[in-house]
Amino acid sequence: MYKRQSEDYAGKDVVLLCILKGAVQFFSDLSRQMTCNLEMDFMSISSYGNGTRTSGIVRISKDMDLSITGRHVLIVEDIMDSGLTLNHLTNILKTRQPASLRIACLLDKPERRECAISPNYVGFVIPNEFVIGYGLDYMGHFRNLPYVGVKNTDNM
């Protein structure tokens, strides 16, 4: 994935946009591997409440600082599940007139998709399991695990 992204963005002015909090570890690893000229920015957007399912309501709690007009934007997300959050986000970002807008996800759950959106770059396609670790959490916990694992849902 890293090599393909570097090739796709060679010679371009790129904004690498991290979606907080879950994508931080993936974002850090990805940014170190990319060989193109880039700036980093951060956004916090969520459709999850305190549980494991989307609330259906997308909320921005921290907007990005950089202008993306005429720039190539790569959204870095931990996981694409229903797609509602990223669909909402891409619609917002398109109004800011970027030169291009693409999505890189560490994990993709296509069987959970509720809207017509797909990532441009995917680390791993996974089944419909609730996963934690490497930035992914359950109620704010387990983000620091150095791996991705399936959470036992019996107690959830």
Residue ranges of predicted features:
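PRPP-associated nucleotide enzymes
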Residues: 3-156
